[in-house]
Regions:
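Hydrophobic membrane-insertion alpha-helices, especially the h-region
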Residues: 6-19
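Positively charged n-region of N-terminal signal peptides that target proteins for export
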Residues: 1-4
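Solvent-exposed, well-ordered loop and adjacent helix/strand elements within mature globular domains
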Residues: 19-145
C-alpha cells in the first residue's frame, strides 16, 4: 500500500512540474487581448470618436487595434489556450476568432491586441466584462512567437 502511495505522489508531482513547464512555455508566446468601445472612457481623445477606425473605415464589429508593426488589413486569429479563454471566445465573441486590424491605439504596443465592441455587441459593458486576457495569436495565418 505504501508503495502505491509513493507512486501516486510521484505521479502528481511529475504532472505538476510538466504542467508548469507547459504553462511557462505558452505564457512566453501569449498576447494581451483587451477590449474597447467608442465611448469617452475607452477613447479619451474627442477627435478620435468620429465613428471611424484609424484606417478611415467606419467602425464595425470585427475590427481590432494592433501595434504599428502589424499592417492594416492583417487577419488576426485568437488561439485560446485555456478553457477559460475558450469559453470567453464563445460567450463574449459569439465564437468569432478572426478579426481584421483596422485601428491603432496610444497604449497598443508589441504583443497587444484590442478588440472593438460596438454598441450592438454590448459596447462598454461587454468590453469591461471581457477584461484583459492572454492568448496565443495567429497573424495572417502565422502563429506568433
Amino acid at each position: 500500500m505504501k508503495k502505491y502511495l509513493v507512486i501516486i505522489v510521484f505521479l502528481f508531482m511529475l504532472a505538476a512540474v510538466l504542467w508548469r513547464a507547459y504553462d511557462v512555455f505558452w505564457l512566453r508566446h501569449r498576447y494581451l487581448i483587451t477590449a474597447y468601445c467608442d465611448c469617452p472612457i475607452c477613447i479619451n481623445v474627442p477627435e478620435f470618436r468620429d465613428g471611424k477606425f484609424a484606417n478611415l473605415r467606419p467602425i464595425h464589429w470585427g475590427g481590432v487595434a494592433a501595434a504599428k508593426s502589424v499592417p492594416f488589413g492583417s487577419d488576426v486569429e485568437l488561439v485560446p489556450v485555456t478553457l477559460r479563454d475558450l469559453l470567453a471566445v464563445r460567450n463574449f465573441l459569439g465564437g468569432r476568432r478572426h478579426f481584421t486590424v483596422e485601428d491603432r491605439g496610444g497604449k497598443i504596443h508589441d504583443r497587444h491586441i484590442d478588440i472593438f465592441f460596438p454598441q450592438s455587441r454590448g459596447g462598454h459593458q461587454a468590453a469591461v466584462r471581457w477584461g484583459a486576457r492572454r492568448m496565443r495569436v495567429k497573424i495572417n495565418g502565422r502563429l506568433m512567437e
